[in-house]
Swiss-Prot record:
It comes from Salinispora arenicola (strain CNS-205). Residues 278-359 form the KH domain. The lineage of its organism: Bacteria, Bacillati, Actinomycetota, Actinomycetes, Micromonosporales. GO terms for biological process: mRNA catabolic process. SUPFAM superfamilies: Eukaryotic type KH-domain (KH-domain type I), HD-domain/PDEase-like. The gene is rny. Belongs to the RNase Y family. This is Ribonuclease Y. Its main location: membrane.
Length: 588
């Protein structure tokens, strides 16, 4: 019995019980009616009506139960029909499965038979292949055996030949031994004869020597000493002549070779750099821009010169202004500041200060980029970042009018060419030459010559001792001890000594202006100092909280007096002390 049949049976039983209960209640109600009091009693009538209603409800419930039972019976019949159909389908499925199983068994038997036949055929092929392989191996083994037998025969023949040759060699050695014995006997006899002759010759030599000593009146030892002294003096003279000739030839050859190397290096470098100028030209989009640069009553040009420390020269030159300053860094910052102001169009004192700060930052970046480009051009890698920053400072540093960074690049190229000609370590020598003036970036901050300062900096940032020694010895503060130091000196001299590289007058002029600024900057309360108008004017910016108006006058006189006492200069120098008070409030 399935689960559905069981549920259906339980439902039928429950309905039957409900119907039975209803019938019993109806029977009890009928009995109550039969034994009830008279119909005239109202209570009886009400009770009767209630019982009739209950009976009617029971009848309707019985009818519903009967209908439910009928539905359940019909559902059970349908379920039995479905179960019969399912049993029929299951029987058909079992028959189909049996048929498929029989077919599979038949197919498996066929496959097994085919596989068995294939296995027998493969086994037969393997047996045939094994038989053929065995035959081939047997043939190869037979061939190898024959070859080995032939080799044994050949070895036996060679052994026989060796034995025969050995016997012949033994016979030859025995014959030679007999000959050597006879020769030894003859030599012994001859040696005895020679000994006797040597004795006789010695006696004759002794007699001759005594006779010579008697005739010459001098002993043999004294004569030997005089002869040795004469020969020694002659040998010394000849050696001295030979040494002088060799030294002269070496000196001439060395000078010629050195001259050839230096000339070749300078020709191959062919630098275009000459002395730096102290004036920069800025082209303007139009002459009307000059009026905006000057400003109302000249306030813009005064503010520009006060902030940058650069002389701004505006003349009749069409669409151009000149910027003059001995300090290349200051001049470049001023040029960039003015260029940005012209492009922006807003030119007033506050804007000049803002753009000046931006220009200074840009110049720092330009210096860093210039140092990196120089390193790439020379071919130097793995250098400390601090050394790169110091090299960038040299982008706007000059020595006797020659740009120091370009001088370092040129010196490195010359040193590399000379090192290659001499077959030396080119990278190390180029590194020595490129870093030899690194100390010039710190001469304003550290006391001492730039060679010693540069050597200390290079040692601090991990450069080798060869590089450090070449730096400290390139101006003979330390005697040069290595070939790297000597080549660094030579390449430095070639770069600085070529025509057009340096100007002594420009260097003296720059030093005079630097000294003027140092004198003014050394006073108490001074914030900034600018040498203007080619040194004919000094503008001193003071801190208003440290210097009052009376002290400003005293400061100007002190600076002028010290300049008169310490410097020699043409004409006059005007000292201008600028004291500016600024008060800023913020409106909220």
């Amino acid at each position: 019995m399935s689960g559905f049949d069981a549920v259906l049976l339980v439902a039928v039983l429950l309905l039957a019980l409900i119907v039975l209960g209803a019938v019993l209640v109806g029977v009890r109600a009928v009995r109550g009616i039969a034994g009830a009091p008279r119909p005239e009693d109202p209570a009886f009538i009400a009770e009767k009506d209630r019982q009739e209603q209950s009976l009617a409800a029971l009848r309707s419930a019985a009818d519903e139960a009967n209908s439910t039972v009928d539905a359940a019976k019909s559902a059970a019949a349908a379920a039995r029909t479905e179960a019969a159909a399912a049993r029929a389908e299951a029987k058909a499925a079992r028959a189909e499965a049996r048929r498929v199983l029989d077919g599979a068994r038949a197919e498996a038997d066929t496959i097994l038979e085919r596989v068995h036949k294939q296995a027998e055929a493969d086994a037969e092929q393997l047996r045939t292949a094994a038989r053929r392989s065995g035959e081939r191996e047997a043939a190869v083994l037979a061939t190898t055996t024959r070859e080995q037998a032939a080799e044994v025969e050949r070895r036996a023949a060679r052994m026989d030949d060796r034995e025969r040759l050995h016997s012949e060699e033994v016979e030859r050695l025995a014959e030679r031994d007999r000959q050597l014995s006879a020769a030894s006997a003859a030599l012994a006899a001859r040696e005895s004869t020679l000994v006797d002759r040597d004795r006789e010759l010695a006696q004759a030599e002794d007699r001759r020597r005594r006779e010579l000593e008697r005739v010459a009146g001098i002993t043999a030892e004294a004569a030997r000493g005089e002869l040795v002294e004469a020969i020694e003096a002659q040998a010394k003279r000849e050696a001295a002549l030979l040494v002088r000739e060799i030294e002269s030839e070496a000196r001439n050859t060395g000078e010629e070779r050195a001259r050839h190397i230096v000339v070749d290096a300078i020709q191959r470098v062919a630098s275009e750099q000459t002395a730096e100028s102290v004036v920069s030209v800025l082209h303007l989009p139009g002459d009307e821009m000059k009026g905006r640069i000057i400003g109302r009553e000249g306030r813009n040009i005064r503010a520009f010169e006060s902030v940058t420390g650069v002389n701004l020269i505006i003349d009749d030159t069409p669409e151009a202004v000149l910027l003059s300053c001995f300090d290349p860094v200051r001049r470049e910052v001023g040029r960039l500041t003015l260029e940005k102001l012209v492009l922006d169009g807003r030119i007033h004192p506050h804007r000049i200060e803002e753009v000046h700060d931006l220009a200074r930052q840009e110049v720092v970046q330009l210096c860093q980029r210039a140092a990196e480009d120089a390193l790439v051009e020379v071919g130097i890698t793995e250098i400390h970042p601090e050394l790169v920053s110091l090299l960038g400072r040299l982008r706007y540093r000059t020595s006797y009018g020659q740009n120091v960074l370009k001088h370092l690049v040129e010196t490195a190229h010359i040193a590399g060419i000379m090192a290659a000609e001499l077959r030396l370590d080119v990278p190390t020598i180029k590194r020595c030459a490129f870093l030899h003036d690194i100390g010039k970036a710190l001469t304003h901050e550290v006391e001492g010559s730039h060679a010693i300062v540069g050597a200390d900096v290079a040692r601090k940032y991990g450069e080798s001792e060869d590089v450090v020694h070449a730096i400290e010895a390139h101006h003979n503060e330390v005697p040069p001890q290595t070939i790297e130091a000597v080549l660094t000196q030579a390449s430095d001299a070639c770069s600085g000594g070529r025509p057009g590289a340096r100007r002594e007058s420009l260097e003296a002029y720059v030093r005079r202006l630097e000294r003027i600024e140092e004198i003014a900057a050394g006073k108490l309360g001074v914030e900034r100092v600018f040498a203007m108008q080619a040194g004919r004017e000094v503008r001193v910016m003071v801190r208003p909280e440290d210097v009052d108006d009376i002290s400003a006058s005293v400061l100007a006189r002190d600076v002028a007096k010290q300049i008169e006492e310490e410097l020699t200069y043409p004409g006059q120098i005007r000292v201008t002390v600028v004291r500016e008070s600024r008060v800023t409030e913020i409106a909220r």
